[in-house]
Amino acid sequence: MVMADQPTMFDPHERTSWYIDDAIVRLRLWGTEYAHPLPEPPAPRVSLKLGSADTCAVQLRDKAGRLSREHAMLVPEATGWEIHDLGSKNGLWVAGARTTKATLQAGVKIRLGGLTLVAESLKFVGLRSLVCRLLGWAPERHAEVDEALQSLRDSAIERTPLILIGSGDLAPVAARLHRVILGPEAPFLAYDGSDVSAAIHAAMNGTLCVPIRGHARASAIADAVHAVEITARPRLVLCASKASQAAALGGKPGQFAVIAMPPLSARGDEVLRIVHEAGQDLAREMGAQSTGFTTHDLERLQTFKFSGMDDLEDSLRRVIVMRVWGVTAGAKKLGLKHSSLSTWARSKNRNLST
């Protein structure tokens, strides 16, 4: 096997606007919460050995027994952390390719023996938190969360088309993910059924979000996006309400990645955590210092039968503006009439105070 002598480097701004380009702060074991923190300034940055030996700064346990005692070395460079193979028997694999050394970028997979690690920055940790909110925090969801994170990274960097499966309007979910992985300045367009060419042009270097309302239409849009030169091609996100819609597009060029969101009705005790985390994000976006949620609000919100994440966020916005600005000013902030917001809150199935 021919091995590259030069470090494998991925410039997130050369072909993409991958927004998660901050410093690597930890290595996390794939499919788990177990992470190895790395030194950060002002702490001195020194080279760190990875392996099974107790003399390694990052000591790892490989049940498969394929990890060398001194398998790899993390080396601090001006551009960030580099990882070097130390002549290990089973080699160093970064982003799916065997190499002797590579510069670590946020989200990249590192395979050492029978172990897979993920290089994480603070922004990437934030993205993982969002994906856990969408998919679940339970241990049995951890591997699925990591697969989704890789799909999002591939969508941003490689323009791999993505299918989101879930209940309700998924465009707001796609938009939130877009802002995290591509940044707030990158264009995002929710397709409304108008001219496809104009929509693709408007979403260049950003994201084109398309609801799957018919296989033929979605397939034609996917073909049109795929025909665009990759450096300008928008990321394509197709939104489906059921897995069968995604399966019908499985053979299209570019190999679709799929992220399936479980219904909120199946999230059980996690709903309260979703409300807290989503509420904090929404309050910050609206310029509020806190959500203002009362104990009664939280009790009532847990009983709501939300149609999807968009419905949940819409409800949280309404409660936040009422608590922070009051019904009159809050309704105005959302572009609603005072009576509309008040009626919504006092309806029998909500029973929220105003």
Regions picked out by a protein language model, each given a short descriptive name:
Residues M1-A4, R15-Y19, R28, A35, ...:
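Bacterial C-terminal helix-turn-helix
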Residues M1-D11, I20-A23, P44, P76, ...:
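C-terminal boundary/linker segments immediately following FHA domains
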Residues M1-K63, G136, D146-Q150:
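Intrinsically disordered, low-complexity acidic Ser/Thr-rich regulatory segments
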Residues P39-R111, H178-V180:
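Forkhead-associated
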Residues S52, P76, D85, G114, ...:
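Flexible glycine-/small-residue-rich
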Residues L130-V258, P262-G268, L272, Q280, ...:
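AAA+ ATPase active-site-proximal loops
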